[in-house]
């Protein structure tokens, strides 16, 4: 595990085992400033800042992923493989077409997939839809 990386100035151990990951860097800052206690900036590269602090007594980090699959792939790969992160929770906003989903409702997605060639670059067959661990949200 070699840290820092080209995309992350943090040292090993700076990130918590659980990282909240919005796409927008300003949303990451908002989460750190409004929800984390004793938040400390651990990464500041290319406008993608990462913070580590405490939420309800649990050590948690938050870092933006930037826009698109290539960007989140880079950051997620480094967090898992270089920094020992165990759980990334993607947080953000989305549109809805269901009549019973209202503005500001919280929706927990069971899985997500894409019709891009991204999964093929990892030799995953077809439209791969990984299903997350329900432990962090139960």
Feature-to-residue mapping (PLM):
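Metabolite-binding pocket within alpha/beta catalytic cores that recognizes anionic/polar moieties
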Residues: 1-138
